[in-house]
C-alpha cells in the first residue's frame, strides 16, 4: 500500500481524506517560497539555488518572478525554457509538468486539487 507522499507523486487521480498529509513537506515549501520571495532582484544565483531545492525538476532555463507560492514543490517539474510571471500559485498536490517554451502569465493559479461540489 502506498503512503500519502507516494500517492501524491503518482500521476493518477486520488481522493484525499487529509490523513497522513506530509505536513513537513508543506512547511519546507512554505519556508523556501518565503525565502525566494524575499530575494533581491540581483540575487539570481540565490534564486536559482532555492528553485533547485524547492522544485522536483528545475531546468536551468526556468525563470520565476516573485511572488511565487506552492503546496509542496517536489511535484513541480520544469523542462527547457519555462517563464513564470509574477504572483503565480501552483497547488501541486499531484505532478505538474511545465514543458519547454511555456510562458505563464501574471496572477495564474494552477490547481491540481479541488473540493467536492456534490453535497451528498
Regions found by a protein language model. Give the residues of each.
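Terminal amphipathic alpha-helical/low-complexity segments used for targeting or macromolecular assembly
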Residues: 1-61
Amino acid at each position: 500500500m502506498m503512503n500519502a507522499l507516494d500517492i501524491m507523486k503518482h500521476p493518477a487521480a486520488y481522493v484525499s481524506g487529509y490523513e497522513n498529509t506530509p505536513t513537513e513537506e508543506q512547511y519546507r515549501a512554505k519556508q523556501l517560497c518565503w525565502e525566494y520571495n524575499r530575494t533581491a532582484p540581483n540575487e539570481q544565483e540565490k534564486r536559482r539555488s532555492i528553485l533547485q531545492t524547492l522544485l522536483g525538476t528545475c531546468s536551468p532555463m526556468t525563470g520565476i518572478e516573485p511572488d511565487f507560492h506552492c503546496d509542496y514543490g517536489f511535484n513541480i517539474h520544469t523542462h527547457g525554457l519555462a517563464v513564470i510571471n509574477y504572483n503565480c500559485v501552483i497547488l501541486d498536490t499531484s505532478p505538474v509538468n511545465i514543458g519547454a517554451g511555456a510562458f505563464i502569465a501574471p496572477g495564474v493559479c494552477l490547481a491540481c486539487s479541488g473540493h467536492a461540489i456534490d453535497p451528498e
